[in-house]
């Protein structure tokens, strides 16, 4: 079994996250995807609670499952002492799935901070790493020079920051997030300007 591990804050999950999961199914190829909701110790918190981010990640997993892929969500990292680290998540996943081939999915923006992550070599020992980089951006020397990283060009003109900004200014989120996530954001009153 090939298991893709997709960690992030998912504050909120958006159509780019959905597309990354679907690309992972086709290009890695991944049989299952594990969406791990976490805090990012390198970024400030943005507004949704842990419970709300887990709820929205569950909605994202339902969208992924509708396409025929097997996706599940874990809040394991949120239950760990803060900050949690990707290497610890991968150790946990490895203990639960000892025979699985693991691939860690990360966006290029997150990978730029990879040298600052806890135990990068441990991460490479536990999993392959697939970096999704936005098309049209120059590939960094760091990514291009690392044979342990699989680079996947990817079009996703949306980010969680954009979704939060649109929500704060009352702009429509349609087309930026799955419909169910949009309804959740609206019903919970998330990301409104203070």
Swiss-Prot record:
Task: List GO BP terms, alphabetically.
Answer: NAD biosynthetic process
Keywords of this entry: ATP-binding, NAD, Nucleotide-binding, Nucleotidyltransferase, Pyridine nucleotide biosynthesis, Transferase
Q: Which Pfam families match?
A: CTP_transf_like
Pathway, per UniProt?
Answer: Cofactor biosynthesis; NAD(+) biosynthesis; deamido-NAD(+) from nicotinate D-ribonucleotide: step 1/1
Q: Which residues form a coiled coil?
A: none
Q: What is its EC number?
A: 2.7.7.18
Q: Which GO terms describe its molecular function?
A: ATP binding; nicotinate-nucleotide adenylyltransferase activity
Cysteine pairs bridged by disulfides in the record: none
What does the record give as the reaction this protein catalyses? Answer: nicotinate beta-D-ribonucleotide + ATP + H(+) = deamido-NAD(+) + diphosphate
What does the UniProt record say this protein does?
Catalyzes the reversible adenylation of nicotinate mononucleotide (NaMN) to nicotinic acid adenine dinucleotide (NaAD).
For this chain, the family text in UniProt reads: Belongs to the NadD family.
- The name this protein carries in UniProt is Probable nicotinate-nucleotide adenylyltransferase
């Amino acid at each position: 079994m090939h298991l893709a591990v997709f960690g992030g804050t998912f504050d909120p999950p958006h159509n780019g996250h959905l597309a990354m999961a679907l690309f992972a199914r086709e290009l890695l190829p991944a049989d299952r995807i594990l969406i791990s909701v976490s805090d990012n110790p390198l970024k400030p918190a943005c507004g949704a609670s842990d419970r709300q981010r887990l709820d929205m990640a569950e909605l994202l997993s339902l969208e992924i499952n509708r396409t025929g892929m097997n996706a599940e969500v874990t809040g394991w990292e949120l239950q760990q002492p803060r900050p949690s680290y990707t290497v610890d998540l991968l150790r946990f996943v490895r203990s639960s799935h000892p025979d699985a081939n693991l691939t860690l999915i990360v966006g290029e923006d997150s990978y730029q901070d990879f040298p600052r992550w806890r135990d990068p070599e441990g991460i490479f020992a536990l999993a392959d790493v697939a970096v999704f980089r936005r098309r049209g951006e120059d590939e960094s020397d760091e990514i291009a020079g690392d044979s342990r990283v699989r680079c996947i060009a990817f079009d996703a003109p949306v980010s969680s920051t954009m979704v939060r900004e649109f929500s704060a200014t009352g702009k429509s989120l349609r087309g930026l997030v799955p419909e169910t996530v949009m309804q959740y954001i609206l019903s919970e009153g998330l990301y409104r300007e203070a």
